[in-house]
């Protein structure tokens, strides 16, 4: 880094950030920060000031020394394909950090909260009525979040600071097709002839959840793309979710907030993508208020495993194959030297949620941080994976940590054997078709499996790569012995705790594969009869 915003393109680590071919022989390139891009946009004056005033703008800068050191450490591996893992994937020798901001426009603040429109002095490049704006922001944010430090916007207990933090994600993504969410195998969707260049003929909602940057408490931002291509934040929907349903959205519990891929003002488009981050205008106030809390109490949270690793999005790796060094991910800790981590994208005939999957081989031992749920309560934790004879056996240990750093367990240790087709061999699991899609019989079969700690895959996704709409018999739920969900633990979760799962290999074969497709956090609701709450099959 030459100056505040200028990078030396002769450094090898920078090649990962900017396509040098587009720059000719220019040795340096100006790389404006997200804050500077906001200052250039006439409708983002308040947010530009907020990032400066709260200190979050400075926190959104990459650790240049760490990233350069990483690239120097692994530059000899660039372009290599490790051949000791059983599959051939390119070594990921470069890593970038990234951030995403969802930002209300000045007019949205004015309309929804009565915040004065900023009076901007072009000569000094400052807002002359900032104190009046700050007063209203303090009042409005204090209605949503506790405001223990109302006078200091940089304090983590200040309501405005919390408001800003809950608009930020610790990964850089674009609101473009197959970025924030991934289209691959959802119900009714067909990729077209080339599975690596999926079609945009969307059929049902696709979504994922991301933990916001607020460090004190877990708030999950739900990003949904509807079949018309629009993106919404915290949209909670009703669906045609019966056994023979189509999962088409039939209504909304909360419509959510429309978010935009680019910032267009009076016919002019302002750049919203910086070197290491981006911002996206939103059409209403984003707040994690009581309405959000109410919706999340009964929300089944299903996340692609790649979402738990922020660097996947920041380095635009979804839908790609990659091999990772052990120190690549910020949410993986205590990784043993013999842990081999790969990302694979779906091939024709595979059954994967959203197309991506992680494979871990070797004598692996690592700890994965998983998000706390934003509502205190009892949750059932599950993972989805594919079963075959190449799969691994692992010991899973569940660790939690309070704000003071004290550690405890949040579940009993569990041995996960992904090579054992339990549901196929025990004679209990039956296909819906074999039960004639009878609602009662299928529900009873699901319940019998669940008591054993297993579940069929969701009906939501199907076999990949077909160019015609898949038949109901090709859904993941129509179980062919190759996919399942395993209940890992049932435990109380607090939004103010940190949660981890330690995975340890119990294999003799170094190429035995730990397969990680998706993870689910499901509230343990019970009805008046005491029977476990039966969620929909999707």
Question: Predicted segment positions?
Answer:
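Mature, structured domains of secreted/extracytosolic soluble proteins
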Residues: 1-538
């Amino acid at each position: 880094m030459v100056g505040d915003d200028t990078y030396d393109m002769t450094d090898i680590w920078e090649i990962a950030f900017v396509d040098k071919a587009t720059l000719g022989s220019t040795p340096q390139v100006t790389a404006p920060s997200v804050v500077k891009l906001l200052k250039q946009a006439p409708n983002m004056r308040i947010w530009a000031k907020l990032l400066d005033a709260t200190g979050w703008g400075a926190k959104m800068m990459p650790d240049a020394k760490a990233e350069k050191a990483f690239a120097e450490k692994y530059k000899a591996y660039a372009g290599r394909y490790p051949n000791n893992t059983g599959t051939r994937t390119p070594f990921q020798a470069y890593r970038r950090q990234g951030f995403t901001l969802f930002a209300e426009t000045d007019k949205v603040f004015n309309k929804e909260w009565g915040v004065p429109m900023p009076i901007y002095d072009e000569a000094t490049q400052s807002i002359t009525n900032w104190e009046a704006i700050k007063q209203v922001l303090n009042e409005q944010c204090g209605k949503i979040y506790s405001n223990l430090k109302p006078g200091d916007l940089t304090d983590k207990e200040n309501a405005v600071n919390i408001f800003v933090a809950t608009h930020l994600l610790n990964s850089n993504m674009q609101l473009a097709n197959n970025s924030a969410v991934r289209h691959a195998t959802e119900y009714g969707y067909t990729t077209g002839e080339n599975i690596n260049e999926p079609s945009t003929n969307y059929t049902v909602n696709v979504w994922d959840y991301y933990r916001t940057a607020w460090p004190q408490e877990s708030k999950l931002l739900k990003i949904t793309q509807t079949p018309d291509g629009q993106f919404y934040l915290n949209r909670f929907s009703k669906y045609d979710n019966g056994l023979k349903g189509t999962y088409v959205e039939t209504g909304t519990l909360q419509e959510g907030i429309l978010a935009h891929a680019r910032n267009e003002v009076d016919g002019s488009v302002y750049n919203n993508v910086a070197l290491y981050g981006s911002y996206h205008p939103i059409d209403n106030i984003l707040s994690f208020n009581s309405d959000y809390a109410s919706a999340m109490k009964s929300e089944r949270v299903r996340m692609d495993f790649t979402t738990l690793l922020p660097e996947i999005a920041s380095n635009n790796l979804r839908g790609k194959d990659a091999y990772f060094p052990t120190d690549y991910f910020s949410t993986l800790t205590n990784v043993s030297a013999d842990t081999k981590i790969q990302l694979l994208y779906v091939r024709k005939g595979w059954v994967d949620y959203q197309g991506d999957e992680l494979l871990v081989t070797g004598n692996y031992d690592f700890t994965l941080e998983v998000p706390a749920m934003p509502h205190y309560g009892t949750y059932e934790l599950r993972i989805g994976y594919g079963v075959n004879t190449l799969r691994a056996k692992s010991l899973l240990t569940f660790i939690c940590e309070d704000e003071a750093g004290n550690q405890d367990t949040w579940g009993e240790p569990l041995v996960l054997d992904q090579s054992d087709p339990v549901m196929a061999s025990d004679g209990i699991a039956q296909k819906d078709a074999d039960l004639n899609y009878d609602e009662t019989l299928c529900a009873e079969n699901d319940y019998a499996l669940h008591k054993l700690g297993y579940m069929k895959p969701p009906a939501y996704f199907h076999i990949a790569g077909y160019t015609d709409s898949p038949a109901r018999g090709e859904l993941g739920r129509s179980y062919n012995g190759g996919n399942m969900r395993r209940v890992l633990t049932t435990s109380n979760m607090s939004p103010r705790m940190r949660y981890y799962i330690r995975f340890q290999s119990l294999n003799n074969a170094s190429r035995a594969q730990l397969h990680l497709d998706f993870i689910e956090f499901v509230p343990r609701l019970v009805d008046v009869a005491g029977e476990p709450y039966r969620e929909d099959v999707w």
